């Protein structure tokens, strides 16, 4: 009796999905690499989506249905731990406040931006610049209806859990947090400055990324992602 094919569905960042020998799957960001009876499906994932984004294309849904193991970028069971780590790493130490670690001009710009959104900078003075930058972007996404809980990875993680599929992760939450926590003070400030400049364009760009992802157009995705 032959063993059933081993099928792994992996969720990766759109910008890093590269499979030189993969077979492109029917106008979607799903690739398949096979060797004999073994198949690996690679799906470019968007981490923030709207609730009405599902179901996805039949080819993606079918890949999930036949998958025995589902591998995600990070362990979504560790989200609470990730939040605790982010808070710990993203908080300024001792008596330091945001005004101490960014320029006066940048501090004023951040304050105006928060006030325009109905918030006070006094609630964010202990955040490191990179943490505040992430928070500002998250606020914009949520206001437009994009939610992490509706992301492609979160969607399929919940389904995999409910259906009893094996689940695994490529990265630890510690590694993901370190990508920001390891920024130098100068890099952290520049990240916040860049975020403020680009903040008004976030939703139009995300709208286009999602539309391009649904259309399965990798050429257009590259243009959108690197402009």
Task: Put a short name on every predicted segment.
Residues 8-16:
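Bacterial N-terminal signal peptides
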Residues 27-226:
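Structured, acidic catalytic/metal-binding patches in enzyme active sites
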Residues 1-8:
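Bacterial N-terminal signal peptides that target proteins for export
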Residues 15-18, 45:
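Prokaryotic Sec-type signal peptides and long signal-anchor helices
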Residues 20-22:
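Boundary at the C-terminal end of the N-terminal hydrophobic targeting segment
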């Amino acid at each position: 009796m032959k063993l059933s094919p081993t099928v792994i569905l992996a969720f990766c960042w759109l910008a890093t999905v590269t499979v030189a020998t993969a077979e492109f799957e029917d106008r979607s960001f799903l690739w398949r690499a096979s060797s004999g009876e073994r198949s690996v499906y690679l799906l470019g994932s968007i981490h923030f989506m709207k609730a009405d984004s599902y179901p996805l294309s039949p080819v993606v849904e079918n890949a999930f249905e036949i998958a025995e193991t589902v591998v995600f970028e990070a362990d979504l069971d560790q989200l609470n731990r990730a939040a605790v780590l982010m808070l710990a790493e993203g908080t300024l130490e001792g008596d330091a406040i945001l005004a101490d670690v960014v320029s006066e001009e940048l501090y004023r710009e951040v304050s105006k931006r928060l006030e325009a959104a109905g918030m006070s900078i006094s609630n964010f003075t202990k955040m490191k610049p990179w943490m505040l930058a992430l928070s500002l972007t998250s606020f914009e996404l949520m206001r437009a209806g994009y939610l992490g809980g509706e992301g492609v990875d979160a969607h399929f993680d919940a389904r995999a859990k409910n259906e009893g599929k094996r689940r695994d992760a490529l990265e630890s939450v510690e590694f993901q947090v370190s990508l920001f926590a390891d920024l130098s003070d100068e890099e952290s400030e520049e990240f916040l400055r860049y975020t403020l400049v680009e903040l008004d364009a976030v939703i139009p760009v995300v709208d286009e990324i999602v539309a391009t992802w649904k259309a399965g157009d990798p050429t257009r995705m590259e243009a959108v992602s690197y402009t």
